[in-house]
Amino acid sequence: PKDLRTARAAGDIGALLAVLAGVETGHVLQQVGQAFAEVWEHGAGPAKRRGRRSVEQELESATMNLSNALSWRDGAGDAPLAAELIARLQGREPEGRPLPVDLGVLAETMASRDDAGNGAYLDLDTGAVLPVAVIAEYGGDPESGVEELGIEPGHEWIVLDDPAEATDADRRDFARALSNGSTLDDFSAGEALNRAMKARGAKNFHDVLDERGLVAVWRTFQGDRRWGRAREALAAQGLRPVGSARSEGPEKSEESEGSAGSAGPGEPGESAESEGSAGPSH
């Protein structure tokens, strides 16, 4: 949500804790974890309306709880994020070269599919993100420069791609999370999604999402998984995301940021047309 992004950008401890107070965050651990990482990166920011030490103690406690939740879930990208949060608590610099990249834009662009090319180009010098398909349209090579896009030569770029099979895995995990949920509605929805994935008839996965009012929940679930895969891809390159840079990826919506306040199974946030944007947890 917008308030979470605002707290992240400001590095405001009090605002971050207020946004998350009483909210179930198990479905958005990557996105909430990134907000915490950026607050720590900013030196723990201004604490308003309460004693600073009290707020810092709240931050430390919440950071430890979040690191534990990430370690328990153990999905793609959860281990490096948990380790980063622990390093902050211990007063150490986290592992990885910091790169000012917008992790949400990178995750979404990595998942983009186009006849001209799949995935994202990432500038290892600036953190800028561009869809491979956009570069392909100009027939250029970003390392040689693409004048029409304002890309100067001499930077090092790599291609990062979210595996096509990841979507099927996300669907199965989403259905499983609902089936293991705490209510009969969760269980019923999970079983309906499992049947839809196995059936060859007209009623498919997205029909069930729409009928059950779970489209936003699915977006959030899949989005958080994509953030994790993007973080893991960066960690494999020895990189650590620390904030946003100029990016030319797919335009982000309010929902692509994920929604800390909108869900886990039972409430949990992709559209039926596109496989994603920004999820319940494991």
Tell what function each PLM region has.
Residues K2-R5, A15-G22, Q31-P163:
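The feature captures two recurrent sequence modes
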Residues R8-A9:
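Helix-boundary capping/turn motifs
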Residues V28:
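Contiguous mid-protein beta-loop-alpha structural module that forms a pocket-lining wall or clamp
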Residues W40, A44, K198-G201, G213, ...:
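Short alpha-helix boundary/capping elements
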Residues T167-R226:
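Amphipathic protein-protein interaction modules
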Residues V217-G249, P280-H282:
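Acidic, proline/glycine-rich low-complexity IDRs
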Residues S247-A278:
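Long, intrinsically disordered low-complexity tandem-repeat segments
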